C-alpha cells in the first residue's frame, strides 16, 4: 500500500508539471542501481519498476531503464554510476523527466567512508542532467540503506 501511495504521489506531480498532450512521447529516464535495473526479479523486463511505470503511464510516455547493478553516486565508490556506458546512454537519451534512484550501494561500509562527499557528488549528478538540452524535470527517489548478510562486506 505504501508503494502505491508513493507511485500515486509521483504521478500527480508528473501530470501537474508536464503537459500530457504533447505530440511526441514524454521521455522518462529511470536512473539507478540494481533496484532500478530489476536484478533478481522474475521476468525483469516486465516487472522492474521502469517497465511497470511505462505500463501505468501509457503511450504518451516513453520510459527507459538506465539501471546498472551495484552502482554508486560516490565518485570514489567501488562502482560509480558516472563511469558506466549506461550513464552515457541516459545523457544521450535527452529525457524530459529523470528519476534518480541511487544511494543504496553508497551505504556499504567500503563506500560510506566517503560519506562527506555524497552530497556534492549527488549535486554534480543532478546538475549534469539539469544542464542537458532537454532541461528535464528531476525527481529524486529516496534510497534505501543496504543490508548485507551478517559477516559479509
Q: How would you name each of these model-derived features?
A:
Residues 8-17:
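Bacterial N-terminal signal peptides
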